[in-house]
Amino acid sequence: MSIEILQKQDKEIFDAISNEVLRQTETLELIASENFASKAVMEACGSVMTNKYAEGYPGKRYYGGCEFVDVAEDLARERAKKLFGCQYVNVQPHSGSSANMGVLFSVLKPGDTIMGLDLSHGGHLTHGSSVNFSGQLFDAHSYGVDRETGLIDMDRVEDMALSVRPRLIICGASAYSQGFDFKAFRQIADKVGAFLMADIAHPAGLIAAGLLNDPMPHCHFVTTTTHKTLRGPRGGMIMMGEDFENPMGITIKTKAGRRTKMMSEVIDAEIMPGIQGGPLMHIIAAKAVAFGEALQPEFKEYAVQVRANAAAMAQKFISLDYNIVSGGTKNHLMLIDLRNKNVTGKVAENLLHEAGITVNKNMVPFDDKSPFVTSGIRIGTPAMTTRGMTESHAEAIVSLIDRVIGAAGSPDAGTVCGEVRSEIKAMCGTLPLNDFSPTL
């Protein structure tokens, strides 16, 4: 995408973008929630669709002139339905957090009880964290992983549910390297009369490719982001495998009298006008492009390689005496407990950044350090796989990471980081991103 006009008009922003292009091109991205969007997705993001207000939904807008943005939103919805095998989808949420808020506000009242995975055990802010709306407006209870295995103990989840009787149970994570047993969660939800929501923001691409458990047959609601493993623009989405009459008794007046609203109608109204106004039509157009890409056979090949690369990295880390929380990975990421290496997550993140490798510090289960320091790092393979890297690259990268972490606290740390940075730049230089290349 050419930005010569920006270079002339706003050199400061142009320089920032230029430097970010170099960073993405010459360094290795291992943050699990990041990826490279295709040039086609980027073009849609930067299209004239950004100029159009379109409050409402296709065919029912509050503004005129929406006939072409309606085409884009209809395509996004139909492609998402095909990709995930769902009956209902709302592609308007601006983010995964907005999608989660839309569901929670649709079925809960302030003070209602919810359950979600503890943030420090791999959950997400919107699953009940005390610093987030989900933990401030609702009575949030967190389940966790077993101290020894690092796995979610479903018996403990059931015990908690029977004790606190939640209105909503959330299954999903931002730093859990195993799959979720959605069927078992649904059985627990049914026992206590709770709604079940799956937040698949991280593994959505792997689920769409059929590589992980499908939440659609078991969960009342499924939310996701559209970037991460889906390689789309930054945004959110709400889905339901099957629509159903809302059990809260919300009705609507029709010519034939009052009827019970379908759950899809409740959610649509909660997104707009409930928590949002005008949708981001350029982003929705880009979502449609990304879903179209994900429906191609090449996307499943990509998803298979993402998981293979993660498995190879985890095994290599384990062979070098690193502690992978839960003992390995079945998805695209791993959470590494660095306490046996006597290095904090913050130190590891900073050293690896100097070495041209981007990761994020992350709390580990039962961490005794603050979120600003942490005892671990989170690593993911979506972006490196988009570069065309395979298992051999994954193993070589782990060896480089080990060199950097092993040099922590030594006088040679700067030299080691410089050497590794040169090797990373050379490795990235042999693997151009092509259709996913971040260019000016």
From Swiss-Prot:
The modification N6-(pyridoxal phosphate)lysine is found at K228. It is an enzyme of class 2 (transferase). The record marks H227 as: Plays an important role in substrate specificity. (6S)-5,6,7,8-tetrahydrofolate binds at L119, G123, H124, L125, S370, P371, F372. This is Serine hydroxymethyltransferase. It comes from the Bacteria. Catalyzes the reversible interconversion of serine and glycine with tetrahydrofolate (THF) serving as the one-carbon carrier. This reaction serves as the major source of one-carbon groups required for the biosynthesis of purines, thymidylate, methionine, and other important biomolecules. Also exhibits THF-independent aldolase activity toward beta-hydroxyamino acids, producing glycine and aldehydes, via a retro-aldol mechanism. Keywords: Amino-acid biosynthesis, Cytoplasm, One-carbon metabolism, Pyridoxal phosphate, Transferase. GO terms for molecular function: glycine hydroxymethyltransferase activity; pyridoxal phosphate binding. Pathway: One-carbon metabolism; tetrahydrofolate interconversion; Amino-acid biosynthesis; glycine biosynthesis; glycine from L-serine: step 1/1. Its cofactor is pyridoxal 5'-phosphate. It is found in: Cytoplasm. It catalyses: (6R)-5,10-methylene-5,6,7,8-tetrahydrofolate + glycine + H2O = (6S)-5,6,7,8-tetrahydrofolate + L-serine. Belongs to the SHMT family. Homodimer. It comes from Prosthecochloris aestuarii (strain DSM 271 / SK 413). Its main location: cytoplasm. One of its GO terms (cellular component) is cytosol. Its EC number is 2.1.2.1. One of its GO terms (biological process) is tetrahydrofolate interconversion.
